[in-house]
Amino acid sequence: MKKLVYVILTMQMNFYKMSIKQRGFCWRVPVLIFLICGYAPPAAAQKANTTDSNAIYLADPTIFQYKKNYYLYGTSGHNANEGFIVYTSTNLKSWEKSTAGNNGYALRKGDVFGTAGFWAPQVFQYHNKFYMAYVANENIAIAESSSPLGPFVQNVKAPLAAPVKQIDPFIFIDTDGKKYLYHVRLTNGNKIFVAEMTDDFLAIKEETLRECITATEGWENTANAEWPVTEGPAVLKHKNLYYLFYTANDFRNPDYATGYAVSSTPYGPWKKFSGNPIVSKRNMGINGTGHGDFVQGKHKELFYVFHTHYSDSAVAPRRTAIVNMGFLKSRNSGADTLRVQPGTFHYLKPKN
């Protein structure tokens, strides 16, 4: 390779001494060298370190920022039938399990709807209250609290009404104040839907319900399952476009991976990114990468928090990981591209 670089530099230095015919050949040589030697598909990531037992075991994680603190919630890797514990951090690196309230639980069974299967929480603030959208008994419910630490409770212990089972809520409040519930409905597969919500977050406006994402591409159903899965929606708005993150395949599948789609409206139609998946076992170095949420750092940097399998040979308990992300500016009038930075991948750890 050093010799090839030397040849190119020598040709460039003598460029203006050459004839027109020689100059034409000079331009072709670097291109040929690049085509022969310079192109290779992106290298696979190094294997993630799964030998460290000092880890946080939360699946379907979400991080909520309030003032100077970050709050981490997720589906428990040990007992998902009691509610949701919460970890806190000031720097997204060192995490401490909360001792406030119900033994560290931000939401606990008995205070809200649900007896089992407490999955996929999302916490957000609206006016002076904090809300947690979550799953229990394969239904979506929303609880409220005066603090991100909880306790999150319901005055009326009930789920959102729906004719089918539904999971994985993500509430997005648009810049015009309208509220949308992105969620998964279990109907001939796990499919992502959206509907506008009422201002009190107690119901959806049924007439606005739209299907957003189903498994239509090869990477989204690598097992050719009869019940294809797209789940774990998370939405952000960038330059007046909506970016919908989603994860495909059964969560037990090593190919569980994350991609995104873009739309000019909250309802779609959604155009899937041609480079999907952008978070996968290939670039993260571990199986089962997905179902996460976005969080912004204190310097406006963007992160994606998600879970992975425990190891290459075991699914559970799933580990909580995070990776940096950013937008690559479009060269034309199209959508900016979301890119992950695989070298920043690491697992979240509890404070010693």
Language-model segments: residues:
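Carbohydrate-active catalytic/glycan-binding domains of CAZyme proteins
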Residues: 45-352
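Bacterial Sec-dependent N-terminal signal peptides
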Residues: 1-46
